[in-house]
């Protein structure tokens, strides 16, 4: 069993290395875009943030920031957002990969809460303890699903982490390739460093909300 597990781990690592090379090429081909968030996207973010703030107030969560992931947005555009409750605005934003399982495509993720599905899961999460990651900046945060659509997240090893080859800038109209995520929200190293700094400074748990 151990040998089989190690072979699988090596294979996954090789696949991700190949994907990394492809992402570098993507970033070179893509048209660079500004850091501004389109008005339509920001309006929906603000609506979600208002609902998120109410949830945080009611459940004793952090009321400085929340993390919002809008999987209805094209994968070549920023769709992970750090929302500043006090400033009522986006503080940081990143590209975000979705899971590749159950016939997900680059343009259309399939969502599932089932172990072994390699799918992203919709719903609210509590961002929990900081731990080592072999990907990105070598840090990840455990996630606990708070709804029926994602309550298997912890035992599925769904975590918030980064991946070094993920571009810092938007690659639209190109999509991010499949294979980067097995269900985890995967973001850029640059934004992960900023997220890590925020989380280390906060005492109360931070809300992460994935929706489409």
Where are these regions (language model features)?
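Cell wall/extracellular polymer interaction/catalysis modules
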Residues: 27-182, 189-206
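Charge-dense polyanion-binding interfaces
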Residues: 206-212
